[in-house]
Amino acid sequence: MIQSHVSVMLNEMLEALSPKAGESYLDCTFGAGGYSKAILESCNCYVTALDRDPNVIKRAEEIQQSYGERFDFVETNFADSFAKLKEKKFDGIVLDLGVSSMQLDIADRGFSFLHNGPLDMRMSGQGLSAEEFVNAAEEKELADVIYKYGDESFSRRIAKRIVEYRKTARIDSTSKLAEIVRSSIGFRKGKIDPATKTFQAIRIYVNDELGELEQFLVNVKNILKKDGRLVVVSFHSLEDRIVKNFFKENSEKPVVRSKYAKDDMTIDPNKWLKIITNKALAPSDKEVGLNIRARSAKLRAAKAIYE
């Protein structure tokens, strides 16, 4: 059964973004449009949405019909969006780094071990597919990718089993890969599926998700107005670490000054952010109970204090 997409930490995102009438916002990961729609409904503002997945265009057109000129969609990944945005600046930017249920639950996309389909996993349908990677990579490279991007302690065992299997048959479906992983480390009922981390790791690798996030953050200052807010929802520790470090490196530590101090404070233009969330916010127990895919989400937000 295909699960309809439920946006994660929607209320927390809106509170952190704080949309205002007349202002412009950038939804960098449109997906099923949950964030874009919520922002548009919150006040009489404008939203530009980005996504590299051509399968979401129909949903974007539906939202455009409802909100007219207040909504615009650009087919691109967020790392390559700067040229297409043509130096436009925004009052707020939001990134939801998770894979939408719409992508996970369609078997032909090859993202999920729960639905048998071709082993693809490409967001845009272009570039190296998961099938090509799994069937061509050396055992060490497979192990390194599964360990680095999936934090999988059994990565070497899984990689060895993959290489052994493909000597007899090509690994061309999600079910085949999932069974190989499960047989490598065992499957205990009631626990998180053993294939979870391996599928996550391969998806991150073939889509260069961490590289794109880092590239976007390096350039985001150029499209965020003064006092504009940057809100990021991540779903695993590698993403969260990148966002946390970026916020830390580009923000001043709070300084308590005496009201009698006479010297002027030194302004460092490289410290252009003020962190809004001192610690990453997590979804409520109630939300996780309603949507298990929210369990690993973390939200961080910061505000631009200089342009």
Curated annotation (Swiss-Prot):
Q: Which InterPro entries match?
A: RsmH, SAM-dep_MeTrfase_MraW_recog, SAM-dependent_MTases_sf
Q: What is its EC number?
A: 2.1.1.199
Taxonomy, superkingdom? Bacteria
Keyword annotations from UniProtKB, A to Z: Cytoplasm, Methyltransferase, rRNA processing, S-adenosyl-L-methionine, Transferase
Molecular function (GO) terms for this protein are: rRNA (cytosine-N4-)-methyltransferase activity
Q: Which residues cross the membrane?
A: none
The catalytic activity, as recorded, is: cytidine(1402) in 16S rRNA + S-adenosyl-L-methionine = N(4)-methylcytidine(1402) in 16S rRNA + S-adenosyl-L-homocysteine + H(+)
Q: Which SUPFAM superfamilies match?
A: Putative methyltransferase TM0872, insert domain, S-adenosyl-L-methionine-dependent methyltransferases
- Say where the protein is mainly found: cytoplasm
Q: State the Gene Ontology BP annotations.
A: rRNA base methylation
Query: Where, per UniProt, does this protein localize?
Result: Cytoplasm
**Residues holding S-adenosyl-L-methionine:** 33-35, 51, 82, 96, 103
Q: Got a GO cellular component term for this one?
A: cytoplasm
PANTHER family for this protein: 12S RRNA N4-METHYLCYTIDINE METHYLTRANSFERASE (PTHR11265:SF0), S-ADENOSYL-METHYLTRANSFERASE MRAW (PTHR11265)
Q: What does this protein do?
A: Specifically methylates the N4 position of cytidine in position 1402 (C1402) of 16S rRNA.
NCBIfam families reported in the protein's UniProt record = 16S rRNA (cytosine(1402)-N(4))-methyltransferase RsmH
What the record says about family reads: Belongs to the methyltransferase superfamily. RsmH family.
Record protein name field? Ribosomal RNA small subunit methyltransferase H
Q: Which gene encodes it?
A: rsmH
